[in-house]
Amino acid sequence: MTDIEIYKSWPFRTRFLRPECWALIKDYIVKHEITSVLEFGSGISTILFNNLGVDVVSYETDPVYLRRIKSYNLANVEFRLWDNITASINGVFGLSLVDGAMPRMNQLSYAIKHSRYIAIDDFSDKESSEGLYPMVKDRTRLDDESIKMAIFRRFKQ
């Protein structure tokens, strides 16, 4: 299935990653040869990552929604339920996507520790003022009336 076909066939009435944001993330994945993704907020992006052949660890807060997404039988995805507090994350991922309505600063702290690049959907300046900018560099931000997406590269440690 193409990306457009996936968007057209999306059956859930939930907020999802907009095609313009996906295009930016997909370009980063291809350009930087990213092979693994840590995702906070399962959904259409999970399917799109899977179709790229990227290995995904995807956290979701809603157990009912998680069961529905799991029904897609995505070969490259490991699903986990997020308790809004802690996560058992090992290793370093090429990219983290922070999406959805979870407590984002907690997710961002995990993303910064475990990823080379951090993509934040519906990015706000409030998040940057809460301590994100000092921990990342090479900020690329696409921001207009319809898109609020930011991608950062963390400092090498």
Regions found by a protein language model. Give the residues of each.
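Short amphipathic alpha-helix with an adjacent loop that forms part of the alpha/beta core around
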Residues: 85-93
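SAM cofactor-binding core of SAM-dependent methyltransferases
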Residues: 19-84
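C-terminal substrate-binding/active-site "lid" region of AdoMet-derived donor-dependent transferases
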Residues: 94-95, 101-157
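Conserved SAM-binding loop and adjacent beta-strand
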Residues: 10-21
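A polyampholytic, Gly/Pro-enriched intrinsically disordered region
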Residues: 77-81, 97, 140
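Rossmann-like AdoMet
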Residues: 1-11
